[in-house]
């Protein structure tokens, strides 16, 4: 049994610093690198790719909506054509820096509101997946487990990785509880680790309404920007290892 640990990185831009990329990157196996629309800029993208390469982890594109002020977490009324174009644009930007470092993009994971829109809207999900497929059909597509993100990508023939979240609560339909709700995040480390093991080992998760639903876990999203993020991810790694679960990069 194996699983990937992924984290969103490269979210600083200009004079704005964000996250602890240098501290978290030795603990993960895949990096989702912001491509300049919701966060990141050309210098940060360049530096983050080099950091990921030096640590031997999978490099992923993390395209988001063009909304720096809202960190890409606010929905936008976009046509499928607009969604397609913003995804291709960001993949091209990241790929340019990958080429100068002689590395390849390994996977793609939509960010924030784009991710949530795709999980719920078949047309948007198809537009995102089609952009990825047309750019490079060999890329691994990361999406929320058991949602349209995964099914639309698979329908096009993309390899997919079903994603679960260590520190997020779930609705009964498998969607994530909205960040607008007070109980959306799991702040207790023991509870989060228990949820991770349950999802990876038994393919189950307990929802916010205390119901048990099926879930597929190919990759676990962890975050590097919390007060206890490093300790949290370290404990997750240790517990996965104790359970006999190998931590391996996507496609590895």
Swiss-Prot record:
Short name of any one Pfam family annotated for the protein: LamB_YcsF
Any GO molecular function: ATP binding
Catalytic activity: 5-oxo-L-proline + ATP + 2 H2O = L-glutamate + ADP + phosphate + H(+)
Keywords: ATP-binding, Hydrolase, Nucleotide-binding
Source species, domain of life: Bacteria
Family: Belongs to the LamB/PxpA family.
HAMAP family hit by this protein: PxpA
Record's subunit section: Forms a complex composed of PxpA, PxpB and PxpC.
NCBIfam families: PRK05406.1-2, PRK05406.1-3, PRK05406.1-5
Name listed for the protein in its UniProt record: 5-oxoprolinase subunit A
Gene designation per UniProt: pxpA
């Amino acid at each position: 049994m194996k699983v990937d640990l992924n984290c969103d990185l490269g979210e600083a831009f200009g004079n704005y610093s964000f996250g602890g990329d240098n501290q978290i990157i030795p603990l993960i196996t895949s990096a989702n690198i912001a491509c300049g629309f919701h966060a990141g800029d050309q210098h940060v993208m360049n530096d983050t790719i080099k950091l990921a390469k030096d640590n031997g982890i999978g490099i992923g594109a993390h395209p988001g909506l063009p909304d720096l002020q809202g960190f890409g977490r606010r929905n936008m009324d976009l046509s499928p054509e607009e969604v397609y174009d913003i995804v291709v644009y960001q993949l091209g930007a990241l790929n340019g820096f990958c080429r100068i470092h002689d590395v390849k993009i390994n996977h793609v994971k939509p960010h924030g509101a784009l991710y949530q829109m795709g999980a719920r809207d078949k047309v948007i999900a198809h537009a995102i997946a089609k952009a990825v497929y047309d750019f490079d059909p060999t890329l691994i597509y990361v999406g929320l487990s058991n949602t349209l993100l995964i099914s639309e990508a698979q329908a096009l023939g993309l390899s997919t990785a079903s994603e679960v979240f260590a520190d997020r609560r779930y609705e009964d339909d498998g969607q994530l509880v909205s960040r607008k709700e007070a109980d959306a995040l799991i702040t207790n480390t023991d509870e989060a680790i228990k949820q991770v093991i349950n999802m990876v080992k038994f393919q189950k998760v307990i929802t916010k309404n205390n119901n048990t639903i099926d879930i597929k876990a190919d990759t676990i999203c962890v975050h590097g920007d919390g007060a206890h993020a490093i300790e949290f991810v370290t404990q997750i790694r240790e517990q996965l290892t104790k359970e006999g679960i190998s931590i391996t990069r996507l496609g590895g």
